[in-house]
């Protein structure tokens, strides 16, 4: 009986997880992305970033300055970032929006993700 209850709870959780992702909209073009972020801050714990329409990224993360460049290529947000003195490799990311938060998924949507509140 305990196994059936656990299995049912697991199935319900998996279905709910699918519903959460289904509520996200993929951002597919530069103008939609810019309308969401330009003149706003992207925030998460210890990180505050600004993205400009001129293709620049600036802000702070964990007490270090962040600078970088970005472009929109083939439906993906592609960026280079310098975090303090450390250069993060060039990466193109899938971007989704759930109405409150932007989620960036590295490696063209196949890698790790980070969600940011828009303020």
Where are these regions (language model features)?
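Lipid interaction determinants
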Residues: 2, 18-119
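Bacterial N-terminal signal peptides that target proteins for export
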Residues: 1-10
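Bacterial N-terminal signal peptides
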Residues: 9-17
């Amino acid at each position: 009986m305990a196994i059936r209850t656990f299995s049912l709870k697991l199935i319900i959780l998996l279905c709910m997880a699918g519903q959460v992702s289904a509520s996200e909209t993929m951002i597919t073009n530069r103008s939609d992305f810019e309308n969401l972020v330009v003149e706003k801050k992207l925030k998460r714990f210890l990180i505050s970033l600004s993205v400009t329409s001129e293709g620049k990224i600036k802000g702070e993360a964990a007490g270090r300055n962040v600078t970088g460049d970005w472009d929109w290529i083939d439906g993906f947000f592609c960026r280079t970032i310098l975090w303090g003195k450390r250069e993060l490799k060039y990466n193109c990311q899938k971007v989704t929006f759930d109405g409150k938060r932007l989620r960036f998924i590295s490696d063209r949507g196949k890698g790790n993700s980070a969600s940011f509140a828009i303020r």
